[in-house]
Amino acid sequence: MNHALRRATLGLSPGLRASRLQQSFAKHQIPAVYRCEAASTPLQRAFTTSRCFRQETAAESEKDDAARREEQSERARKRQARNVTSGSSAQTLENDRPWHRADSGADPDAPKDVPENKDMKKGRLLTTPTRLLKLILPMPFHPEQEHVNRPVEGDVDDAGATVEPLALLIHPHQPLSYLERLIQAEIPPVQYKGREKLPDIVFRAEADQNEQDGRKDDNKKKDNANVASYSGLGHEGPTNKEANWVRWSGSTEIGDFIRDAARGREFAINVEGFDRELRVAVPSFRDRTYYMRMTLRRMSRDIESMSKVKNECDTLAHQGAHRLAQGGFAALAGWWGVVYYVTFHTQAGWDLVEPVTYLAGLTTVMGAYLWFLYISRDLSYKAAMKVTVSKRQAALYQERGFDQNRWDQIIHEANNLRKEIKIIASEYDVDWDEKKDLGGEEVKKVLEEEKQGRDGTKVTEGKDEDDGPGSSDKIKKKQ
């Protein structure tokens, strides 16, 4: 039989012989995973390696797709088994619910910004370098708890475990209803009449209602009966065990709510179906303006160092302008002396001096007129001083390495920060010690001068460039 097979093989062409041998080797020697079909090509060498790899990849992808479909079908069956409601208001089911998320696998020894679940009994409202506020809220719900009003049974492992605290970034101008939606999306639903619904969230804060309870002192004036009291201390204030609480509307802005709640140490968040309320410490004025004041202090140090260089350059520029003015007076006095000497002490006399002085005076007037056309400003001593001082200042700034653009920017930002802090201080009804954060009276004076304009080198708002008799304010007063 082997002899006959050998004769049949020798009777084939070389190309067919090679393909037949390769097929036989692939069928009997290579495992079944690496089997492939090699098309016979006459008079050509058969290459099947890349085709084998493609078939292997296709087989693996088919297996992965089959496993994925099986897993999806199994998950769908589990979801269908746990499906207890069909209402449109129901939240996502158990596997997709955010309160069932496991804690992150971070290093347990690494420092944490948020305390442990068991140690965090009260929420916190923190300020950020931006205008946003960071609300850290404890979540007293078990990871396997499906409804707020139905706690987990006692046979569950770690019955006292709770979900990790929740962090939310909110803007002071957003309403409380927006914060309510954020909290509702992160807590379990409530079971109500056999259906799931989102639990209602109520925000309550301490209120000044002593007048209604009759505990107000009779010695106080009746004029202040309808005036709310503010302290701005927040969580830094004293504890008031007999505090009066009031419910706030969801349309109230978060910033207004926090500002009013700052009269007490904390505000409360009530969740429907949960027997306890969530307390959150209220930020004080110092907390709300912490990053603003730190930024202002850093800017104040830069302003103080840059103002020294700027004052030196400005002083030298003004001294140079005054010396130039004095030099002009000396030139006029010298010209007067030359005319006097030539007229009365030489043989040239007035016949020669008269046309010379006439032409010199006319040339001076023409030059002054051309200079006025060039600068397009009022022809006055103040305008001439401005041009001279500004050019000298620019040269000195460049020589000393003073950046005028950066100076203007940092002054503008510092004044804006001062304005924002003053607004918050007025809202909290506290007195802000501006000198302490600015680093002294000198920086405050520099900011005020740069804001209002000084030395005639900066234009103030609502005024012309020259505060002379033709200024806009004086013209309005005359009218």
From Swiss-Prot:
Residues 60-75, 94-122, 206-224, 445-462 have a biased composition (Basic and acidic residues). The keyword Cell wall biogenesis/degradation does not apply. One of its GO terms (biological process) is mitochondrial calcium ion homeostasis. The keyword Phosphoprotein does not apply. Ca(2+) binds at residue 354. It catalyses: Ca(2+)(in) = Ca(2+)(out). Residues 56-125, 206-238, 445-479 are annotated as: Disordered. The chain crosses the membrane at residues 324-344, 355-375. Residues 345-354 are mitochondrial intermembrane. One of its GO terms (molecular function) is uniporter activity. Residues 55-323, 376-479 are mitochondrial matrix. Keywords: Calcium, Calcium channel, Calcium transport, Coiled coil, Ion channel, Ion transport, Membrane, Metal-binding, Mitochondrion, Mitochondrion inner membrane, Transit peptide, Transmembrane, Transmembrane helix, Transport. Its main location: mitochondrion. Residues 83-93 have a biased composition (Polar residues). Residues 1-54 form a transit peptide. A motif (Selectivity filter) lies at residues 350-358. Residues 59-79 form a coiled coil. It is found in: Mitochondrion inner membrane. One of its GO terms (cellular component) is uniplex complex. It is a multi-pass membrane protein. It comes from the Eukaryota. Homotetramer, assembles in a dimer or dimers configuration with two interfaces. Highly selective calcium channel localized to the inner mitochondrial membrane, which mediates calcium uptake into the mitochondrial matrix. Mitochondrial calcium homeostasis plays key roles in cellular physiology and regulates ATP production, cytoplasmic calcium signals and activation of cell death pathways. Sufficient to operate as a pore-forming channel without the need of calcium-sensor or auxiliary subunit. The selectivity filter, in which calcium ions are arranged in single file, is composed of two acidic rings separated by one helical turn along the central axis of the channel pore. Belongs to the MCU (TC 1.A.77) family. This is Calcium uniporter protein, mitochondrial. The gene is MCU.
